[in-house]
Amino acid sequence: MTVIPRSPQGQAQAPRTQPFGAEAFAPQQGTTIRWLGGAGALINSRGTTLMTDPVLEGFDMPLLADAPIRAGEVPRLDAVLLTHCDNDHFSRDTCRRLGPVCGGFHAPHYVAGLAAELGLPATGHDIGGGFDVGPVHAKLTPADHAWQNQSPKHKTREFLMEDSCGFWLDTPDGSIWAVGDSRLMPCQLEMPRPDAMLFDFSDSSWHIGLDGAEKLAAAYPDTPLILWHWGCVDAPKMKEFNGDPEVLAGRIVNPERIVVLAPGQPWTLRRL
């Protein structure tokens, strides 16, 4: 596994960002995944481009890693996929900038409503529902992340299970599962085998937790685990952001399949 750099406070830190430009959005053979930092990704599947939860500007906490591209530099997108409303996933500043070059925004109904309030072309979906973006078929998978109901400061409404999701993407070159922020759910252990997982391993009570990450990884023992939701926010005492790949490697079966990307670094999807 890649040597993990450390912040002065000892927090595991993402490798140095690898900036990219318009070339990452061009027609190509195959499917590539680029981590955008945080819980964001750019997926280019034979020229069809999607971003999941892009936070490219406007975040309100200090960062350990720069975004590999600014929102205003994105030449085009076929779709943006949003898993839930937290501002480290649904960046209003980023989405406003992407709106003019994006074919559409897809999210659970509640989040799509928030995006529509910004004037964005947003479509809401049921959990388990699907839609097509070019050759990519996307399906919303369940997530358990209604943490606001336990925080009077943040409970602006009764948050529902269906307000959050993951995304399962079937591409011509294999399947990608962006699990999303979620406590471990039994149904997440019974999915078809994905060819790659965008894997949150935050040891937080409203995330997968290390025990949950161990179980989820064991359910799909050969699937490459592209780590995200770690190493980018300067918050050494916040479990939501301070995951350590070296700790995860000591907990899971077949740790050699852990993929530690630098933000912006391309990774090629292959069928298992």
Q: What name fits each language-model region?
A:
Residues 16-25, 40-85, 92-97, 147-158, ...:
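Pre-active-site segment of Zn-dependent metallo-hydrolases
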Residues 26-31, 44-50, 130-139, 170-176, ...:
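Beta-strand-turn-beta hairpins that frame and shape the catalytic cleft
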Residues 32-35, 59-67, 89, 121-122, ...:
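Short gly/ser/thr-rich secondary-structure transition/capping motifs
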Residues 36, 40, 132-193, 211:
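Catalytic core of the metallo-beta-lactamase
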Residues 43, 53, 84, 91, ...:
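Divalent metal-coordination and catalytic microenvironments
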Residues 68-131, 139-147:
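Active-site HxH/HxHxD metal-binding segment of metal-dependent hydrolases
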Residues 91-101, 117, 236-246, 270-271:
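Metal-dependent catalytic neighborhoods of phosphoester/phosphodiester hydrolases
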Residues 106, 110-113, 184-268:
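Cap/insert and terminal regions of metallo-dependent hydrolase folds
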